[in-house]
Amino acid sequence: MSTRESFNPETYELDKSFRLTRFTELKGTGCKVPQDVLQKLLESLQENHFQEDEQFLGAVMPRLGIGMDTCVIPLRHGGLSLVQTTDYIYPIVDDPYMMGRIACANVLSDLYAMGVTECDNMLMLLGVSNKMTDRERDKVIPLIIQGFKDAAEEAGTSVTGGQTVLNPWIVLGGVATTVCQPNEFIMPDNAVPGDVLVLTKPLGTQVAVAVHQWLDIPEKWNKIKLVVTQEDVELAYQEAMMNMARLNRTAAGLMHTFNAHAATDITGFGILGHAQNLAKQQRNEVSFVIHNLPVLAKMAAVSKACGNMFGLMHGTCPETSGGLLICLPREQAARFCAEIKSPKYGEGHQAWIIGIVEKGNRTARIIDKPRIIEVAPQVATQNVNPTPGATS
């Protein structure tokens, strides 16, 4: 796992007390409207959805719309589909460049959950806090934009426009669009009994970034210092930051290689919320049962010490730019997990078999006492700092 030197505001002629996360009251994808409320709010959009297009396309082409993270819209010509997603988050780490990378990875992740590996175009949506000084704005916002741009280039796409507005809180997001043939994406509705559930990033990012901020808040740090050291927190924070900035593109490609039946990415509703949403979309009468929870090292202990206030053990803790939850044939899952670790994909990363697909009523649950898999930090050094003079 690559590491990055801690962001030093003074390097950019900012006050040493500058913290990007102070320009929002919510963190990351913890900004999401609760799932049950969202479904009610979207009911009016779902009425007569796609009715106009039926006269052109009938039901021959697969389509997705309201209620899922990505839309799949058949185009009127050429047997192609538009696959598109939009997302935005609030700052979750204090490093502006890495926050830009995380925001971009978070937008692209919904395409990757469809097995799409190529993005044709990105737009960036940026809310600049009106509480920033001119100096803070002029130093920090270019770093965020550079991080977003670099992540887009890593994904093989480019940012061609967007929208920038003033806002009380910093808002970071975008739109990702591609045009695909039917064999270039995987519909998220084909899970069958006997499949297994695979997760491609560990849980606990929200816990890691929260407790990292607690290092500066003695009354909160005192609650957890018996179960975790400052070094543990720093390592978990680094691991969380690099994981959030990592694209799910490799996993998306391997979904095709190993015949994935369905997938979603894990973000603001936590692993259980997203598993439940995916289960509801299945054509077959199945349910998902989660037995294992891979968690960043020491973050499970921190969560327990806090009385499970994060909801980590219950699967409701929000994640930001989390991994893919993939339904794979049982005989393919171990090979998927081995392949994604291969050095041919850069550093190689872990994936875990965390549960099963069984006959059921399109629900998802975590067993009463899931096995917690402590995911140790993978520490290596690699300079991912942009050149200060290039973006300030």
From Swiss-Prot:
Residues reported in the UniProt entry to bind Mg(2+): D69, D110, D265
Cellular component, GO annotation: nuclear membrane; plasma membrane
Active-site residue list: C31
Cofactor(s) the record lists: Mg(2+)
Membrane topology: Peripheral membrane protein
Reactions the enzyme catalyzes: hydrogenselenide + ATP + H2O = selenophosphate + AMP + phosphate + 2 H(+)
Residues modified as N-acetylserine: S2
Ligand binding (ATP): K32, G67, M68, D69, D87, D110, G161, G162, Q163, T164
SUPFAM superfamilies linked: PurM C-terminal domain-like, PurM N-terminal domain-like
Site (Important for catalytic activity) residue list: K32
Homology family: Belongs to the selenophosphate synthase 1 family. Class II subfamily.
Subunit structure of this chain's protein: Homodimer.
Function: Synthesizes selenophosphate from selenide and ATP.
Protein name: Selenide, water dikinase 1
Organism: Mus musculus
Gene name linked to the record: Sephs1
